[in-house]
From Swiss-Prot:
PANTHER family assigned: MITOCHONDRIAL INTERMEDIATE PEPTIDASE, PROTEASE M3 THIMET OLIGOPEPTIDASE-RELATED
GO CC annotations on file: mitochondrial matrix; mitochondrion
Record lineage: Eukaryota, Fungi, Dikarya, Ascomycota, Pezizomycotina
Protein's name according to its UniProt entry: Mitochondrial intermediate peptidase
Pfam family, one: Peptidase_M3
PROSITE patterns named among the record's database cross-references: ZINC_PROTEASE
Length: 790
């Protein structure tokens, strides 16, 4: 049951899109070479902010873009009372984790004891709240410790965070095998008076917890449950070995240097010795060969080597898949996919495959149209006699690059200034804040920190202020590069929303603690808000946004390329879900929702990033304050999205492969993952995959996203529908319409995971056809399609 509490938060929120893009492109943050200091342009009155709001709006840009302003802003910190990391008053020093863990386990033991001895109707009515509190207490340590161990630059803090993480994780696993928690929750659920007293949110959390208890073996005999535990551990170990040990069958290729015509001369020279060029199949030079080398046979050899994983890698993958199939059957499920999808919007693998096939059919004409253009290029290439009337897999990159090079050449001739000059970090965040204010009535306000509150000197704290509710969340922005920092953008929810009732404060009055008040003791000294209508406090969602942008080089700010701007909007979409999804119960707050709807807020935010009305809020030249020339951006986006349908086809094929691998096929003694891979590509790929390749050995997402790889495609289709149907694709001011923003907030965001995703979707689209979910609704979403050319 309590496994769930680490489901979305025990690791940073890094979506599949973020990982794919960071692997394809190491971010390049261009800076506009100029000697002038970034000017402080006064905020325009058109944004409709109050005087204080305008001051906050201006400060938001300056804390990121103006070095002298930031230094002055930080100085206010030194006069304040010391605080622990993110305001947690236990963590003023590394050893504070010891007290934090000790107190947490004491409080958890108290909750377990209370649940275990529940007898009366009133006791059982509080059962869900009590178990949710237990989840929250454990998550407070697990989530924060996991964040500190991966992000904090201080080695001693890292060491103590690792110890805290493992101690509490082990304690949590003990609770997972404690039948009394399951028995008491089931008893409470079976009492009509109790069940009817629960809110819809409580009923959903009860169902989630019951499903998770059952999934992890509670209710089974001891021997079977132990086998489940052992299988789960073995899957985790083999899966990690698979991801960490991925290697090609052929690590290096050798060619005569004269055969590499078309490759960048400097790169070719660096790779060549005594007339022989060595190409590593796991590094960027192999991709360069596929894109630029004229010799089709060299490209063919390179493609086959790049797409063929080693035998040991394939063996580890197949072992993981077989173990997962065994785990599912031992747990009473037909397949691992059935087990995984039970609590997702899709519900069944049949529904997922229905969605994928509908999406495949919708995208097929555009995929073939793009392929036809590449074929025309190949037919016009007088030097190619290699299958002249067929597009081969090793040709696609080469002719796509030729097409893009033509577009790039025309683009550069028209470009008088760098696009990045219009996208400083501060102006982009200022634009996001203005967008949030227009649509949802919330804005980002820079806040001085207390000594010890942030883990690195360059971290900025932004308070999220609602125009009706005041302070509603805290966002820490760790956006700039430093040694040892992960290059992957990530959204961490360090503390979730949860309602703290008067009864809990009463309990804290009778517990010894170091704090000045019961509410501080209940929240480890962190920020809360008071809800007068409910006479209760709410934990403020506390979020960390991690990026790896280049540091500003005074006097100019850090400037972002198009990919970085889109990434920042995407990650702020996750943050928005946490900010507005402030539920009473922690288990369903913010991003703690079904995996196949979790990416919706972030993907939808990408649609806003380059909408003309939204661009008018922020895209201005860092030095001259001139507005962005829209034609310049449109040309750049046309180039960046030119390969969109080819990439979409690739993602559909991988999602289909994921479902096939998590069906009952691995239970067959003759199971061969390579045969399944080639069968999938033979049936559906527009360009045939060469015989003998084994690319599935490089499909690392099979471990972390097993049976759910379709989710990002699913959310792209939904986001596209909402962008068109609710926000009118930005036309007629739709992207800034408060009424439309409130509709989306009230039907989707504010629920977190506390409402059925199909009901959310039907509400925001005002389309009852999809409200019931099921295979028919999945087919309908697939038919909506994805406009991959935008």
């Amino acid at each position: 049951m309590l496994k769930r509490l680490a489901r979305n938060n025990s690791s940073p929120w890094i979506c599949s899109r973020c990982l794919q893009q960071s692997q394809r492109q190491r971010r390049f943050n261009s800076t506009f070479a100029a000697t002038a200091t970034a000017r402080d342009h006064a905020p325009s009155a058109l944004y409709g902010l109050s005087a204080s709001g305008k001051t906050d709006d201006d400060a938001l840009r300056k804390v990121f873009d103006n070095a002298s302003f930031w230094e002055s802003f930080k100085r206010g910190t030194s006069n304040k009372k010391p605080s622990g990391i993110i305001g947690n008053k236990y963590l003023t020093h590394p050893d504070g984790f010891i007290d934090f863990v000790t107190v947490t386990i004491q409080r958890c033991n108290g909750v377990v004891e209370k649940v275990s001895r529940a007898e009366t109707i009133e006791d059982f009515k509080y059962m869900v709240k009590d178990l949710d509190k237990l989840s929250d207490l454990l998550c407070r340590v697990i989530d924060l410790a996991d964040f500190v161990r991966s992000t904090h630059p201080n080695r001693q803090f890292q060491i103590m965070a690792v110890k805290a993480y493992h101690t509490v994780f082990q304690y949590m696993n003990q609770l997972n095998t404690t039948p009394v928690l399951y028995d008491q929750l089931k008893k409470a659920s079976d009492i009509p008076e109790v069940f009817e007293s629960w809110t819809e949110e409580e009923r959903i959390v009860a169902r989630i917890l019951m499903e998770d208890f059952a999934r992890f073996g509670i209710g089974l005999d001891d021997a079977t449950r132990q086998k489940l535990v052992d299988l789960s551990g073995e899957i985790a170990e083999v899966g990690s070995q698979f991801v960490e040990g991925m290697s090609p069958e052929t690590p290096t290729l050798k060619f005569e240097s004269k055969r590499l015509k078309g490759l960048d001369p400097n790169l070719a020279k660096a790779l060549t010795k005594w007339g022989e060029t060595r190409i590593s199949t796991m590094h960027h030079e192999a991709q360069a060969v596929l894109r630029f080398v004229d010799d089709a046979e060299v490209r063919r050899e390179t493609y086959s080597a790049v797409r063929t994983a080693g035998s040991s890698t394939i063996a580890r993958l197949e072992k993981m898949l077989k173990l997962r199939a065994e785990l599912a059957q031992l747990s009473g499920y037909e397949t691992f996919s059935h087990m995984t999808l039970e609590n997702k919007m899709a519900k069944t693998p049949e529904a997922v495959n229905t969605f994928l096939k509908a999406l495949y059919e919708d995208s097929r004409p555009s995929v073939l149209a793009d392929l036809h253009e590449l074929m025309e290029l190949k037919r016009g290439d007088a030097h190619q006699d290699n299958f002249p009337n067929r597009m081969n897999a090793w040709d696609k990159f080469y002719y796509t690059q030729k097409m893009l090079s033509t577009m790039e050449g025309a683009y550069k001739q028209r470009t008088a200034d760098s696009l990045s000059a219009y996208f400083s970090v501060g102006t982009v965040l200022q634009g996001i804040s203005r967008l949030f204010d227009r649509l949802y009535g919330v804005r980002l306000v820079p806040q001085e920190t207390q000594p010890g509150e942030v883990w690195e000197d360059g971290v900025r704290r932004l308070d999220v202020i609602s125009d009706t509710e005041g302070h509603i969340a805290v966002l820490y922005c760790d956006l700039f590069s430093r040694p040892g920092k992960t290059p992957n953008p990530a959204h961490f929810t360090l503390r979730c929303s949860r309602e703290i009732l008067p009864a809990e404060l009463e309990e804290m009055q009778h517990m010894p603690h170091r704090f000045s008040s019961p509410i501080e003791a209940a929240t480890d000294g962190m920020s809360v808000s008071y809800n007068a209508s409910r006479n209760s406090y709410f934990q403020l969602p506390t979020i960390a946004l991690i990026c790896d942008f280049s540091k500003p080089s005074s006097p100019r700010p850090t400037l972002l390329n198009i990919h970085d701007v889109r990434t920042l909007f995407h990650e702020m979409g996750h943050a928005l879900h946490s900010i507005l999804g402030r539920t009473a119960l922690q288990n369903v707050s913010g991003t703690r929702c079904a995996t196949d709807i979790a990416e919706l807020p972030s993907v939808l935010m990408e649609h806003f990033a380059f909408d003309p009305s939204v661009l008018a809020l922020y895209a201005r030249h860092w030095d001259t304050n001139a507005p962005l020339p829209l034609a310049l951006l449109e040309n750049r986006l046309a180039i960046d999205n030119r390969n969109g349908y080819s990439e979409l086809e690739s993602q559909i094929l991988l999602a289909m492969l994921d479902q096939a691998y998590h069906s009952n096929l691995p239970l067959d003694p003759a199971f061969n993952s390579t045969s399944v891979y080639h069968n999938t590509y033979t049936r559906f790929a527009s360009v045939p995959e060469p015989a003998g390749t084994r690319w599935q050995g490089f499909f690392g997402h099979l471990f972390g996203y097993g049976a759910t790889y379709y989710s990002y495609l699913f959310d792209r289709a939904i986001a596209s529908r909402i962008w068109k149907g609710v926000f009118n694709e930005g036309r007629d001011g739709g992207s800034l319409d408060r009424e439309k923003g409130e509709l989306y907030k009230n039907e989707v965001l504010r629920w977190g995971g506390g409402r059925d995703g199909w009901v959310c979707l039907a509400g925001v689209l005002r389309d009852g056809k999809v409200g019931e979910g099921g295979e028919g609704a999945m087919r309908e979403v697939g038919k909506w399609g994805i406009d991959a050319g935008k």
